[in-house]
Each structure stands twice: as structure tokens, then as C-alpha cells.
Amino acid sequence: MANSSSGLAVSDECKVKFRDLKARRSFRFIVFRIDDKDMEIKVDRLGEPNQGYGDFTDSLPADECRYAIYDLDFTTVENCQKSKIFFFSWSPDTARTRSKMLYASSKDRFRRELDGIQCEIQATDPSEMSLDIVKSRTN
């Protein structure tokens, strides 16, 4: 289904891979990109379950926008093991203005397609999505 504000569709693969991450924990992270030619949101990269947060942040391009999902494992102050699914909107300052506008106008609709997201982070610089910042959002 196309996004009414941006005209973008969401590929079925996006939904399938997200369900695999959520239900089976098949992936640690998923990076999504907007394909300008097809006007569709597609899977760009998949992170294996053994990959860490550094692998995830390294997979985001320095000068292009992306959406991403990260499945964060953490320990609560009560010493309980938990996980939360984070949605990232990555829009670096060096990205093209048109790209930033397209990602911004499609974000809410795309996020609604992915049922089960627990936290959201918007970042324009790597410092805005440091692991400490992400962990602070688990409370």
C-alpha cells in the first residue's frame, strides 16, 4: 500500500523480515532504505543475531538517510534479562535535502506498518544514538 503523503509503498520483505526479528529473533537489526526509482521502502541490510550495536551503527551510511530496527538486549536494575525493539530514523546532516524530506514524510506511516516497536530514536549524528542514550530509553 502506498503512503498517502509521500507516495511510497512498503515492500512485503520489510514486513516479513521484521516479523522474523520480532518472533524468531532471526536478526539483531534491519536497515531499510527508500528506493527512489521504485518509490518503495526496501530492506537494505540484515544484522545477524550475534552482531552488536557497533556493527549496527557502522552499517548506517554517513551521508544517506535510513530507517532501522534494532533488537536491544539489556539487564534491568532488578537483574532481569529483557529486550526492546527500537525504531531509528537516521537523517544525517550531510544527506540530500530531498532525501531528508522524503524520509521525514514517510516515517510515521512506515513505523505503523511494523507492529511491536517499543522505542524510537531520531538521529542526525552518531552521538545522538550512542549506546548509552539508547539504553537510557529502556526505562
Curated annotation (Swiss-Prot):
Q: Which SUPFAM superfamilies match?
A: Actin depolymerizing proteins
Instruction: Work out whether the entry's keyword set contains Cell membrane.
Output: no
The UniProt keyword set, sorted, is: Actin-binding
An annotated GO cellular component: cytoplasm
What start and end residues bound the annotated signal peptide?
A: none
Tissue specificity: Expressed in pollen.
Q: Which family does it belong to?
A: Belongs to the actin-binding proteins ADF family.
Q: What is this protein called?
A: Actin-depolymerizing factor 2
Organism annotation: Zea mays (Maize)
Q: Which gene encodes it?
A: ADF2
